[in-house]
Amino acid sequence: MTVVVWVADDTWQDCVDAARAFGGEELLLLHVSDHDVPGAAHGAFAGLFGRHPSRDPGARLDGLAADHASRLLEAAADRLGVPCTTSARVGRVEHEVVAAAREASLLILCRDGDVSHAGPRSLGPATRFVVDHATCPVLLVWPT
């Protein structure tokens, strides 16, 4: 079975370090880019009639997000140091993570809220959704 490692911008190092313990499993490094920011830029540009489509800032943001995801996944794979696959998705982050982990044997993610105290506030909204809706076991890592 596959172990899915959520490679989020601020917490990916801790998740990748935790994933090394599952070296015998097939590892999938997952990054999700939120579709809201490029979508808002596309929408704002669409409201400006007469603008040439090549100047749409949403397209540039899409490209920047794809480049960022690629670089982050490459850094995560290098840090992991074992064979793995990578996946870059775009959409509602929490929904994409849950969908990617649907057939997984384990999902590894990291607390991303107020980690000065234990409890529900130590999870950000997307992470809380994933913990509540994942259909596989979840390894919740404390950030260092």
Task: Indicate where each model-derived feature is located.
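A short acidic, glycine-rich active-site loop
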Residues: 51-71, 116, 120
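Glycine-rich, Arg-bearing micro-motifs that act as flexible, cationic patches
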Residues: 109-133
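Small/aliphatic-rich secondary-structure junction motif
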Residues: 1-55
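Short, flexible loop segments at boundaries between secondary-structure elements
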Residues: 131-144
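Active-site phosphate/pyrophosphate- and oxyanion-stabilizing loops and adjacent acidic/basic residues
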Residues: 17, 74, 95, 128
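Structural beta-alpha unit
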Residues: 11, 77-107
